[in-house]
């Protein structure tokens, strides 16, 4: 065991750490939520990370995304992510896919090869397709609900989607998954009521333009770290296969 994981082994034990180092996790979306999930998984010793995102780093990402610095503006997020992961753990196997995940691109992925899937996607269509594919493959998945227009990082909870409240995205997901015969999904969601858009965003909404949610440095990142914590605990504490 390398020195960098000593503190993790002290907390989890050698067998649990070995399970993390042998695990392969797929992370869909590397934005304000997913970037922090990636960071924590890399620092926790996850041995293989598949990183999926088709976006590039922009100046508007600087307020909340851990991959965004002036040095990375203009880079593909998957490239910035791989560079960062390997700077933390050079032995991690990192696979990158500059793909916008949709039902049409889902065929590029074999979901049975993953030990865990993390959904940090911000489109309902993509989220539904990802959950459906994970469900069909029998692969554990955790999904993040809405983090935009929120300021209370302490309002997040982990729950089955049937137990959520106050989150419009969770409500839509619950309804649409039910139509697909999927009754249960572990999610991270916020019980905080979304704030009302202000300034230019309100004007855009009034004109019928796409509404971009406001965001902070700390709310999406908190959700991302909670996602990572659930993945690490589920993998590390899993019963050994017979």
Regions of interest found by a model, annotated:
Residues 1-26:
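N-terminal charged helix/coil linker that caps or initiates catalytic domains
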Residues 2, 21, 109-114, 121-126, ...:
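Glycine-rich phosphate/adenylate-binding loop
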Residues 27-29, 52:
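Conserved N-terminal Rossmann-fold NAD(P)-binding element of oxidoreductases
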Residues 33-34:
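Hydrophobic/small residue at the entry helix of a nucleotide-binding pocket
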Residues 42-48, 136-138:
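Conserved S-adenosyl-L-methionine
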